[in-house]
Every structure is written in C-alpha cells, then in structure tokens.
C-alpha cells in the first residue's frame, strides 16, 4: 500500500502501474474538501516513485464519484472571497498535478461521474466507461459554475459547442453520447472495465498510443478561429439569455468565462474560472439553489425512512377516469404498478384511457419507448364500470368530482368492495380528510393523496394525515407515491391542506390589488419577470380554472373565515358570473386560441376590462415593489402559520412543496429561504406597511418573535475551514 486515506487509497497494481481507488465510507464517493486534500497527499507519494509507468483511477462503489459534497457548500460559500479563491487555487493545483504526471493516466468510470467527479476524470489522459455512465457538469443548476477546471478542460476536449451545451444547461450525458462527442474513449461491460483500462494504459506505456499528444490540447488555448468563436459564443449567450433569464446568473457567467479564456492556456484560463466562480458562490441564488438540493435530499430521505417497514403496493386502483384519473393511472402503470381504473360511464373511461395512451405515444414519438413497451404499459391499466379486480388492490385513490357528498358516497361504496387492509385515499384538493373519513368504517385506512395537474409533470404529491389516519396508511401511500416517481410530502389535515391553503391568500392579495385599481396585466408581468413565477396570478387562475378557484375560494373562506372571508365582490366572482372559466372554455382574464401545436395561447381581450371595472376602483399605477409585497405577504404569512400550527413539519418540506407544487421560483429557494434572505426583521417592517389591508397581512406571532431576536428559520451555518487550503487550513 503506497498511501491510505479516509476516502481513497493508492497501491501498485502491477510492474510500474499504480492504482488510485476512491472508496469512501458509506454507499457513494463524493469529492469533498477532505478528499481533494487526500488526493493531493496521494500525488505527493506518486511524484516520488521513480519507477512509475502509469496510473489507473477507479472506484470501489457503484458510481465513480457522484460529485462534490453539496452539504459542504453553504458553509463553503460563507468563506470570504479571498480565502475561497485560495482554496480553489489549491484544489486546482491538485488536479493540475494529476494531469501533469510524467506518465499516462486513465480513469475507469462506472455509474455517475458528475460535477467534481467529471472534472477529476477530465484531468486524466484517457477515460473508459461502463454502459451505465452518467457524466456531466450540473453546477449551473446550483447557481455556480465548474470550479475544478471543468470550464477549461471540457471545451478543449470536446470543442466549444458541445462543452457549452453541457456546462450552460448543467447537463449530464449517457455512455453512448459521451463516446460520440469524445468525452470518453470507449465503453465496455462493467466486468471488463478494469482490464480494459489496463489494456489501454499498457498501450500508452508501450508507445502504441500517443498519450502526450492526447493531453496537449487541454493545456493550450481553444482551437477556434475568430469567426467560429464569434458564432459559437454569440449563439450560446443568446440561448442562455432565452432559457435561464436574468434570475439565474450562473449559465451566462460560465459562457462568458469560457469565451474570455478561449485564447489562453490552462493556467491563465483557470485563473479566470476562479475569478468567475467565487462571486457566484456568494450570491443569494446559489444559496437558494443549493438549499433546494439539500431540502430535496432531506425530503427523500424522510420518505425512505418512513417506508422502510412497509411493502410498496403491487396493485392500485383509481376511482374516476377523466384527465386526472387517466394521468394517475398512466403514472402508476408507467412506473410498474398495475392499476384498475373505474368510472360510472364509458365516455369517462374512454377519456381516461385516451389520456394514458396520449402520454405513452409522446414517449414513443420521443424514442423513449418502443411499441412493445407501450403495449405492455397500457395493458396494465384495466378500465372497468364495475368493481372487478378491486379484491386484489393494495391502495385505491379517489379522483371524482370535488363535491363532498359525491366523494363520501363513492368512498363508502368502495370501502365495502376492498380487502380490510386496503388503503383508501382521496385526491381532493380542498375538502378536509377527517370530514370525508366520517362515513368510513375504517378511517385509520384512509388519507389524502393530492396530485397536481398535469400528473405526469408535477413532482409533488401531498399526503394528508386525517384525525384517525394510521402511520401504516401514511407509509403505504408514501411508498406508492415514491414508486410513481413523485416527491411525497406528508401534511396534517386542514381546509386546503398546505399548498392550496397558502395559494389562496396569494390570490386574495391579487383580488385586493385589482379592487384597488391595479391592472392585472402589469401584476402578471411583475410577478413573472421581476419575482420569477412561471405564471402571473391572472394567468395561473385561468389555467387552474376560474370556476375551480371560485369554488375553492368559498371552501377556504368557510375554513378560515377570519382571514379568508371577503366582504366585497372580486374579479374571480365577476369572471365566474360571466362564464369566463379560463383556458377550459377559452375565456378568462385572457382569451385563448390554439397555436399550431394545439396548445392554448393567450391573447388580450378588451371585454374583460369592462367586467373588472364593476369590481375595481379607477385604474392607478402601483410600483413593482408594492405589487410584490402585496402579493407575497399573505402567502408567506400563511406558510408561517402552517409551520406554527404543525400542518407542515419543517421549513425544508414547506419550501419543497412550494417549489414542486406551485412553481415557487427556485432561485428564491422557497418562502422560508426567501424570508431568511430578506431577514425576519426587515420582512416585519415591510408587512407592517400593509396591515391596514386586513388580517391576511397580519404577521403571525412566531414570526414577530423571530424578528425581535433577528432569528432565521433555517439553521445558520458557520464558514467552512476547507482542508488543504493555503491559509485557512
């Protein structure tokens, strides 16, 4: 053994060939600060070996290196800029030493090689991969850019266009694509990986492969003519501006850095990468996006722990076909859980099966599946007008019309047709679960399972615990949701549960703005372009359905009369009374026509202004800041109340529910991350300016208390002391 660290070791493999093996405690390898330092120590040893002829890098895990240790990021990003720059310089000196070894080097790459893992293998001369490879640089999705030489080596290895596509989009690619673009030199079966890598290394040692020529382009300026460079970088900047926009500075910073470094050799180019990385790491966007990643890991780990003692349902059923029922049935079948889909009409069953078939055909058109797979999946959805097959189902989700009487009747009837241990769930969006459970003989086997539309795209499922719901029931439903590829978040019962409960105060803020003379078009523009929502409130209401919102508004007002009962006729009432239900009938705040792809496209409709004039004061202008404050304060206050009342268990789960269920702008990180970024005291000052608008603007007691003590909702991290840094070790 030449060297043994906590996460890697170095040993002789055969005459003159050394093997550096990543083998961290636990299930995966991460390129954390300690591992970078350990890699440096291993290189200290290697550089002293006079008889060294070649080096092989490999992993003992199912994945090579999954990336940097993102749990370190928040504390690392608090390190002063100069010290962070010094540590990056140290880390890059390690990878440069790996690249500059006076012998050929090869990485045997299996599974994931992402972020720092990808940057590590870029420093070797050759890369041999297994068919399960996923390799790429996802840093821009975290609000940063590659910092270990990825923005320097990848363009010089692949060419500017392919590298820009991967780096700017934060993409990873599979083995076939990686081979096609030159990111790996070969693909072999997993059992042949080590021997195959050794064979390539021996060829390089023997002179059959020119490893020095292979290495040289990574050390030199990018080989692009002026015209080629202008075209590549102009197109890349245009694409990034269109897709990422101003709220996500990392992609455009990465492109501009690669452009500026194109005429430079490795050392000078790495200096530019360092100078670009450090300011990005100190942005609110980076902290928010890293926070989302960590929150997602937390939510998934919680679901895994919750379901460790239950068996994932093997057969499921959906009550109510239609678009929603068909979407749920498709998702279950697609992920390998056969499903019975029941309705009372052939027409609805046809609609549900058509929806499932449409989604499968899209997969076929994109080349994701073949005809055999399509037929196999669709055959696991059994449409029925009766309860045939319900004796074998483990879980049933009801997705009928949003009417408590209808839902109660359907649930009670179904309970009599299933096994005593079968779990029942309701896809209600607003009706309290304990109310629906009142008609059941086994309320402990019942909970809420709130999917979001469209089911196949929206990652969130709210799992709602009723008054009598058992832990086992929750665990089974969480297991099914996870199997369906969804992110389940458990919430406690109340009108609207969590997501809709906090959405309707936001809509109420919108209604009050319109009542006071705001133009809905400007409100939409500000909330989309300035705050970053994917849709403004008027557009969102049209998509949800004005009739649906009108009904839900009444349910929420009955549940929370003190805050959500309004004493005026609002824009939603006016549009509802005029039969303008949004996209579903082509008329809402906007008029809708189908585009060439058959999708609804919004257009101006002057008729809506006269309708809104009856429920609004004369038009007046509001500043962007005032619009954002009046829209967001009611939502944030309600989010905080849900935490204080135990409806949602943690800030992390609340923020993920908002991002995954409502499209809360990821660069803000969710309501609690946004609150922490503003500061509780500053938020309180802002909210107090609008208290005259009513109870929705009154800040909850717990938040007032935090403001007094200047406390945050997320645990505050201390600046890191990176291992191996020049002046901070």
Swiss-Prot record:
GO terms for cellular component: fatty acid beta-oxidation multienzyme complex. Pathway: Lipid metabolism; fatty acid beta-oxidation. GO terms for biological process: fatty acid beta-oxidation. The keyword Secreted does not apply. SUPFAM superfamilies: 6-phosphogluconate dehydrogenase C-terminal domain-like, ClpP/crotonase, NAD(P)-binding Rossmann-fold domains. Its EC number is 4.2.1.17, 5.1.2.3, 5.3.3.8, 1.1.1.35. The active site is at residue 450. It catalyses: a (3S)-3-hydroxyacyl-CoA + NAD(+) = a 3-oxoacyl-CoA + NADH + H(+); a (3S)-3-hydroxyacyl-CoA = a (2E)-enoyl-CoA + H2O; a 4-saturated-(3S)-3-hydroxyacyl-CoA = a (3E)-enoyl-CoA + H2O; (3S)-3-hydroxybutanoyl-CoA = (3R)-3-hydroxybutanoyl-CoA. It holds the Pfam family 3HCDH. GO terms for molecular function: 3-hydroxybutyryl-CoA epimerase activity; delta(3)-delta(2)-enoyl-CoA isomerase activity; enoyl-CoA hydratase activity; long-chain-3-hydroxyacyl-CoA dehydrogenase activity; NAD+ binding. In the N-terminal section; belongs to the enoyl-CoA hydratase/isomerase family. In the C-terminal section; belongs to the 3-hydroxyacyl-CoA dehydrogenase family. Involved in the aerobic and anaerobic degradation of long-chain fatty acids via beta-oxidation cycle. Catalyzes the formation of 3-oxoacyl-CoA from enoyl-CoA via L-3-hydroxyacyl-CoA. It can also use D-3-hydroxyacyl-CoA and cis-3-enoyl-CoA as substrate. This is Fatty acid oxidation complex subunit alpha.
